[in-house]
Amino acid sequence: MPERRGIVLVNAVSEKDLGEDKRKREKEKECEKLRKLLVEGLEGFVIDEKVLQAMLRVPRHRFVPEYEQRAAYVDMPLEIGHGQTISAPHMVAMMCEILELAEGHKVLEIGAGSGYNAAVMSELVGKTGHIYTVERVEPLANFAKKNLKEAGYKNVTVLLENGSMGYPGYAPYDRIAVTCAAPNIPETLLEQLKPGGIMVIPVGSYSQELIRVKKDSTGKIYRKKKGDVIFVPMIGKHGFRRI
C-alpha cells in the first residue's frame, strides 16, 4: 500500500507539471498573437522591416514586472519600479530605426531599465554585434540581467554604473542610445561615439525633443530634431540632478 501511494503521488505531480507546462505553452502562444497585433500597429510609426521583425521576435512580457503582464502588449510605457519605466513599443521601434542599427555594431545604451530595449537592439546587431547597457539602479540592473539571460540574449552586457558619463571602458561605439532625458547633449558621449556613428538622445526638461546626432568621418557633429517625447530624467554629472 505505501508503494501504491507513492506511485499515485508521483503520477499526481507529473500531471501537475504537465498542466503547468500546458499553461505556459498556451500563454506563449497568446503572447505571440498579441505581439503580432502590436507590431502590425507599429507600421504607422516605422517603415524599416528589419526593426519590425526584431520587435516581433522579442517577448516583451518577459521584460515587465508580474503586475504589468496584462499590459505587456499595449503600446504604452509601463512602470518597472524605482521611478523608472519601460518605453512604449512605438518609441523603442522609432529609436532603433533612427539609429540605423546593423550587423556587427557595438552599441552603448544609457538606461537599461528592464532590458527590453537592449533585447530589440541585440536582434538588430546580431551575433557579431554587442550591446553594452548601463543602469544606475542596482535592482533594475539585476532585473535586466535576469530577463536577458532567461530570454537567451548572450550579446548584451549590463553594467551597474551611472550612465551620464557614458562608459569609456568599451568606447568608441558605433551607436549610442540614450533612454533618459538630458539637459543637453553630454560632450563625453560625443567623445565616445565613433566617426560615422549615430546617437539618439532626448533633450530637455518638461518639453523634450528627440535628437539624432551624427558624427561624420572628420568628427563634425550634425544634429536633427526627430519629434517631441517624454522620458524620465537623466541623473548624474551630466543630468538634471547630481548623485
Curated annotation (Swiss-Prot):
Key words of the record: Cytoplasm, Methyltransferase, S-adenosyl-L-methionine, Transferase
Enzyme class: transferase
GO process annotations (BP): methylation; protein modification process; protein repair
Active site: S87
Coiled-coil segments on the chain, per record: none
Gene Ontology cellular component list: cytoplasm
Molecular function terms, GO-annotated: protein-L-isoaspartate (D-aspartate) O-methyltransferase activity
Gene3D superfamilies according to UniProt: Vaccinia Virus protein VP39 (3.40.50.150)
UniProt EC number: 2.1.1.77
Family annotation (Pfam families): PCMT
Catalytic activity: [protein]-L-isoaspartate + S-adenosyl-L-methionine = [protein]-L-isoaspartate alpha-methyl ester + S-adenosyl-L-homocysteine
Location in the cell: Cytoplasm
Residues that span the membrane, as ranges: none
Highest taxon listed in the record's lineage: Archaea
Similarity-based family: Belongs to the methyltransferase superfamily. L-isoaspartyl/D-aspartyl protein methyltransferase family.
Purpose of the protein: Catalyzes the methyl esterification of L-isoaspartyl residues in peptides and proteins that result from spontaneous decomposition of normal L-aspartyl and L-asparaginyl residues. It plays a role in the repair and/or degradation of damaged proteins.
Protein name: Protein-L-isoaspartate O-methyltransferase
Organism: Methanosarcina mazei (strain ATCC BAA-159 / DSM 3647 / Goe1 / Go1 / JCM 11833 / OCM 88)
Species classification: Archaea, Methanobacteriati, Methanobacteriota, Stenosarchaea group, Methanomicrobia
